[in-house]
Amino acid sequence: MVPKPLSLLLFLLLALSAAVVGGRKLVAAGGWRPIESLNSAEVQDVAQFAVSEHNKQANDELQYQSVVRGYTQVVAGTNYRLVIAAKDGAVVGNYEAVVWDKPWMHFRNLTSFRKV
């Protein structure tokens, strides 16, 4: 039987090592993680898809400008939650888009799109 102080120490060490791995904080499964590289080709492609798909669905004419911030969530594929700057006529506004992406199936779906 392990003495109680040693058991407590082992528990604390285990909890600490589980909280930080490789200098990175762990995110709960299914949690949203900030996107580190907003200018990556993948993120830009998803953002442009979101604006284009919104324009088709809403018969709108927004023009993509940039990604302001974004998060990903691992599901059966990846959810992207992006704040996108887009031009509506002469006015640039921010819009939040959620896109579900499964690249191995060539599947991409605009889940939501709204002005923020």
UniProtKB/Swiss-Prot annotation:
One of its GO terms (biological process) is defense response. One of its GO terms (molecular function) is cysteine-type endopeptidase inhibitor activity. SUPFAM superfamilies: Cystatin/monellin (SSF54403). GO terms for cellular component: extracellular region. Residues 1-26 form the signal peptide. The record marks G30 as: Reactive site. It is found in: Secreted. Glycosylated. SMART domains: CY (SM00043). Glycans are attached at N109. Residues 30-89 form the Cystatin domain. A motif (Secondary area of contact) lies at residues 73-77. InterPro entries: Cystatin_dom, Cystatin_sf. Keywords: Allergen, Glycoprotein, Plant defense, Protease inhibitor, Secreted, Signal, Thiol protease inhibitor. Belongs to the cystatin family. Phytocystatin subfamily. Specific inhibitor of papain family cysteine proteinases. Inhibits papain, chymopapain, bromelain, ficin, human cathepsins B, H and L, actinidain and house dustmite endopeptidase 1, but does not inhibit human bleomycin hydrolase. Inhibits papain with an IC(50) of 2.47 nM. Does not inhibit cysteine proteinases belonging to other families including clostripain, streptopain and calpain. PANTHER family: CYSTEINE PROTEINASE INHIBITOR 5. This is Cysteine proteinase inhibitor 1. It comes from Actinidia deliciosa (Kiwi).
